[in-house]
Each structure stands twice: as C-alpha cells, then as structure tokens.
Amino acid sequence: LSSLQEKIMDLPVGRGEDEQYLKVHPDFTAIFTSNPEEYAGVHRSQDALRDRMITMDLDNFDHETEVEITQAKSKLSRNQSEMIVSIVRGLRKTGKCEFPPTVRGCIMIARTLKVQRINPAKCNGVFTQICQDILASETSRVGSKTNQDRIKGIVEELVEKYNH
C-alpha cells in the first residue's frame, strides 16, 4: 500500500544499506487483475487495498474474437470453432448458468476434439457428451445434479441447433 499511497517502497531489513525504503517513480501506476470472489481459490481483498482501486468489470469477448481465440488455441477449422463458440454463447445467453461459460470452455471443447481426433459431424453423440461434460462443469461450482442435468439438456439442444 505504501508504494501506491505514499510513493515509497519498504526494503527488507538486513540488506546492509542505510536506507530502509526506496522512492517510487512519480508516474508509477499498477494494474491488478483478479477473479470474482465467488470463484474457487479466490480470497477477499483487504479493504485498505480496495479503497485505493477502481474496479472495472470486463464483458466477454465478441463472437469473432472468441472464434479466433478458439481456433488459434486448438488448431481446429474455422467452421468447427464457430460451431463451438455458437454453442457456448448460446448457453451463456440463456442466463440459466450459475456461472456463465467463458472462452475457456470453447478452448477446452476444441482441444478435446483435436486431441481425440473427433469430427463433430460424424460423432454427434460423443461431441454432445464432451460439450455437456465440459460446460456443466464450467458453469457450476456446487455440483448440483439438478443444475447439471438442466445445463446438459440445454447443451444438447444447442448442439442439435448448431451441429450441421
């Protein structure tokens, strides 16, 4: 906090130097990133730190960017990447998820298809199962069977809609 508020940084004791602090450059700024507190493994920020920060919630990427990211991270075809992104965005749009799916879900599905050499058009049942398993897991933190079954049903409908 001292480097943000007072523009000094405390140095560890025992460095053998006379000065116990370092002046911070007057133009010093910092960018902090964090996940929402409801994510597993995230700890609440200290109030003193939060008082000195501006929080900017970021929205999801646009459709084209999600397709490009999915394709780049998986090396799948553009058509397959578009289909995966459409399914994930369709699920997100329903608003029925505890946590909306992100581009990470797209990447996980795409990489699974690539590694397993699965063609969604020829293996629709396997493709549907992969999408259901990944998206039910990504959108729920409590693991409620009822919620996961509902998500899997929605995903099945979306796969039927977009896998042609």
Regions found by a protein language model. Give the residues of each.
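C-terminal regulatory/interaction module of P-loop NTP-utilizing enzymes
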Residues: 1-164
